[in-house]
Amino acid sequence: MNANLELLSDLVHHMKYAKYLPDKNRRETFKETVDRNKQMHQNRYPDLADEIDSAYQFVYEKKVIPSMRSMQFAGTAIDVNPTRMFNCSYLPVVDWLAFSETMFLLLSGAGVGYSVQKHHVDQLPEIRKPIKSRRYLIQDSIEGWADAIKMLMRAYFDGRPLPLFDYRAIREKGARLVISGGKAPGPEPLKKAINQIQSMFDGKKDGDKMTPLECHDMMCIIADAVLAGGIRRSALISLFSISDEGMMKCKTAYDVVEEEILSTHDGVYNIRLSVWRDGQYCKTQDVFLDKDSYQAMQETGKMEWYYFYPERARSNNSIVIARPLITKELFETKWDVIKNSGSGEPGLYFTNSIELGSNPCCEISLNPYQFCNLTSINVSNLESQEDLNERAKVAAFIGTLQASYTDFHYLRNQWKKQTEKEALLGVSLTGIASIDESDFDFAESAKCSVEENVRIAKILGINPAKRVTCIKPEGTGSLVLGTSSGIHAWHNDFYNRRLRVGKNEAIYKYLLENVPEVVEDEVFGDGAVITVPVKAPDRAKIRTEDVEQFLNRIKHFTKTWVQSGHNGGMNTHNVSATVSIRQDDWSRVSTWLWDNQDAFNGLSFLPYDTGTYVQAPFEDIDKTRYEEFSKRVQRINLEDVLEIEDNTNLQGELACSGGECEVY
């Protein structure tokens, strides 16, 4: 790893995963974070202390990395709430407890996949509006927030008294969170979510049923409250029926039927808009538009969905496509919707059973009420097949340790039962774009992971994993390792990589004093932007590659790595990927997808972005600019960054659909 990537690695670890050490007035070093993670397992399994120590040498050397959730929360936070060990979860919305459990899971830091397929949502009871009411004091905890949602659902689905929520026990905004780290969000995010959901219920009549779109919106509102609480961003995937037009269109523009200009100032319009879809009234909303946006609305008669339902941005949405039932004609119809959306949504989720689901990034195949943990292998600096095999064993060893933390609380019993039954692993690869995959036998290394899982599972007294290998998008984890993201190509031969930072954070002040060249004020905000120049390895794959080359790489690793680690279940795990499609390539991609349905489960799609904008997360630069900038970049000692109080941002690794959306 060169000096620039080392700096980027240090910064991301410090900002996202390092625990605050109050006795030292600083955050952990990478070694201290790994020490804490390793010690957690050694405390639980003292007889394996030596083996654990040997395995973690690969982590210190950044050849393998555990679950980033476990790196973040290792110790008391996981002891208190083992849900924090797991990256991935899935549940169908067949019971109103799904909403409170989702609040609990998201607040615990897990990504949540959920199904609002029609046959699932139809199982919810009819609305029974509450007649009586009673005061309800919300407790200041993850469980307390989840219970507040549970009480609200119980009132409208079970006819119980309507809770009059009392928020006074919730700590004020900015109070320190001792166990998990970071700052308390205060009661406002929860209060806003409860009011929004209650308003939705109040718009229904006794005996009405909730629609899939309404259930989806409630999930997104819950996720919005969690984001405002600083835990995690975009941590949902919503799976919906192929015939559901409401879900299909929920992230498309609305028809404007009435507008009233309330005020104008310096070219900004404050307008009250009423919007319709398919001839039915949807919503009236006050919005602020600049001159260009106002003129565009006048010309098209439409306004984008996010002005009216911004919470829908919290979820990635995917059509559930049953492989045994889909026809080419129906597939092409849905593909045209994705192409014409301009945003690549919804995504596609091919499955052998509509009862199975996935996590937000779609690399894990999950049964209802099931968790999976993740580990990653850095393949960018492999020395030999033996080296790869050894890393595969270590990643499976650590993943199997992680899989044993199933002493869940709060959740229904089926979560523990289903998770223990299949004891899933998600052993991933990252840095693939730096190597020639034909130099290695990934099927052989996948078998090494499977065999090691069987060995250590027997020692721990848990079941061997039904599914072991996957490829996840790798988000900020790849930055910590200094690699390209999962299966994805490097951005370019030379580029600037940007991270945002608050000016109240100690790291900002330290960088400003020691390496001011990498810090600048944020143009469209009150924070700052850190810029680090990056050089892709020689002969690395970069994002200008042909789209079929990328798709065939996905297919290759599905066949060799993922399927070789499959021991059971109707779906294998998956290669998580976002496919960027040039204007002339949509037809080619459609043909490839139809012809290669067995080479993927879920994929996300985006129009290929050739544009530039100020302070973009990735910015192409040439070799001269890279070399000039690099001369001014130096390694820094983050132990010198002193913090009088904990300003940790718990958003950590974002639960996103691809490898290039983790910056902000």
What are these regions (language model features)?
Residues M1-Y664:
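Extended catalytic cores of very large enzyme megasubunits
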